Amino acid sequence: MSVMFDPDTAIYPFPTKPTPLSIDEKAYYREKIKRLLKERNAVMVAHYYTDPEIQQLAEETGGCISDSLEMARFGAKHPASTLLVAGVRFMGETAKILSPEKTILMPTLQAECSLDLGCPVDQFNAFCDAHPDRTVVVYANTSAVVKARADWVVTSSIAVELIDHLDSLGEKIIWAPDKHLGRYVQKQTGADILCWQGTCIVHDEFKTQALTRLQKQYPDAAILVHPESPQAIVDMADAVGSTSQLIAAAKTLPHQRLIVATDRGIFYKMQQAVPDKELLEAPTAGEGATCRSCAHCPWMAMNGLQAIAEALEQEESNYEVHVDERLRERALVPLNRMLDFAATLRG
């Protein structure tokens, strides 16, 4: 009988917050980064959850701001020889797996993810070994070694479609690491899913009591929820989806006021998509008094302007992502399956 690692008992130490920069310092680093990107034949790939000034810089320099699936597509297809990945470590690893010939830089190699940390490979391997009859599907928010154990990698934007497909083939599933997303997918598809018990430290902090109070304060608002949130929060939603799907929902919903239950980094692109709508942050536990993440990933916040400039300028060994070649080849198989499946959905 395997003993599952219990992420709920783990307390992940948060990184130190970057020192705030002055207006002049920000301007200095922005211009420096633009120059270094050209000199290095590099392009920025930034996640929706990075700080607004990072997303803005990616836009201005011809880079990409997107969810993890589109980040993977963009980086693999772009002709630049160097990718500067503004995100968390698994995103840099994924870029290297898909583009081994490219130099993959990150502002810091210490930018973690609680879902990744909550799925240690030794315990996960033992869990999979105890259920050899199940197809292993892992979320993109996992390490390269966990991906290498999987049959499929998936992002939240195509999770329901993929599991529905596997269920139609009669396959039973191991899902890891996010338990909330796994339960959401199970509810949507009816598939036989055995869930690992990881959580995102940001989404897990949204609580129904505080959200209900905000809903009563703004009864005309629609509620948009990422499926990494607890089921009780998902049940309150007018729209549920990945980051890109939530932005699309913001445009199609008729409501002029939107309560958004995901990392507040998404507000930069969402507000661009709906400039005339009011966006409200869904409250986290304690409404700011006792929350740990307070609706913003502390590791995403490590992607500051100074750190990006240093990654492009200094010794690459401190900022370059490496993945063992044999491991990369194994992890590439389920990643390519994901990309091929996503391509069929796009038509």
UniProtKB/Swiss-Prot annotation:
Report whether Iron shows up as a keyword of the record: yes
Amino-acid positions noted as binding iminosuccinate in the UniProt annotation, renumbered to this chain? H47, S68, Y139, A140, N141, S156, H226, P227, E228, T243
What GO biological process terms are annotated to this protein in UniProt?
'de novo' NAD biosynthetic process from L-aspartate
Query: Which GO cellular component does the record give, naming just one?
Result: cytosol
Location comes to:
Cytoplasm
Record's signal peptide: none
Q: What is its EC number?
A: 2.5.1.72
User: Per the entry, which co-factors are needed?
Assistant: [4Fe-4S] cluster
Catalysed reactions listed for this entry: iminosuccinate + dihydroxyacetone phosphate = quinolinate + phosphate + 2 H2O + H(+)
InterPro entries, A to Z: NadA (IPR003473), NadA_sf (IPR036094), Quinolinate_synth_A_type1 (IPR023513)
> What does the cofactor section's free text say about binding?
Binds 1 [4Fe-4S] cluster per subunit.
Q: In which pathway does it act?
A: Cofactor biosynthesis; NAD(+) biosynthesis; quinolinate from iminoaspartate: step 1/1
What keywords are assigned to this protein?
4Fe-4S, Cytoplasm, Iron, Iron-sulfur, Metal-binding, Pyridine nucleotide biosynthesis, Transferase
Q: Chief localization class?
A: cytoplasm
Q: Which NCBIfam families match?
A: nadA, PRK09375.1-1, PRK09375.1-2
* Function summary: Catalyzes the condensation of iminoaspartate with dihydroxyacetone phosphate to form quinolinate.
Protein name per the record: Quinolinate synthase
**What species was this sequence derived from?**
Escherichia fergusonii (strain ATCC 35469 / DSM 13698 / CCUG 18766 / IAM 14443 / JCM 21226 / LMG 7866 / NBRC 102419 / NCTC 12128 / CDC 0568-73)
By which gene is this protein encoded?
Answer: nadA
